[in-house]
């Protein structure tokens, strides 16, 4: 996936598979002279790779277990699958800050790359996911390859994008049986009611903050109805990863005074 031609093909194939389904792809920036050998060169390497899809995530450098070197995208894919499995196969949680079973982050030739958190955050801000050593190596980053060109939550955040795609694919699989049924009010209401029950379950389990599906007349003009097309509209709000947790501290003089004087005269 570090080859621009391959990366372009992978990104092109993530949307409308068989005309219906969406997915995500994980790409690597080459960890050698054809890509980037230092973190300051990663932004340019990402641009040369052509990684810009909201359905793609980009990784740099590589991970090593002893002398064995692995593409970071492969390790991230395994971490993503493990995170999903731990959450009932619902992709609402980011794989970032999860343990990676590696002993070092390296270039292709095995040269160690030791990124501190600020350097890793810089890469995250360029739409690149990496790994840091924080009491053990952890995957680090939440943004898709489309960031920072887009800040739309459903296109920027990998976990949100994956939830959108998963929900959209499930909708197709669930209601495919309804295709070619009479397009009457009963059909529309059955889809709306059934999907809202499913969505309410997501909210109750804290998979997302809100979920509702509606049928709007203005999105279903007579030309569409005559063409056999019905359109529903889903409003959903997966939770955003808590990427920054800030604690404000100040000195409590009243507490000191009360402790020493009892608050009296």
Language model features with spans:
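A glycine- and small-residue-enriched flexible loop/hinge signal that marks low-structured segments
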Residues: 1-174, 211, 216
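Residue-level marker of positions within ordered structural domains that often coincide
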Residues: 2, 200, 239
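Alpha-helix initiation/capping motif
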Residues: 34, 38, 116, 184-186, ...
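Hydrophobic alpha-helical scaffolding
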Residues: 153, 157, 181, 185, ...
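Extended, compositionally biased non-globular segments
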Residues: 163-219
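Compositionally biased, low-complexity/repeat regions
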Residues: 208-265
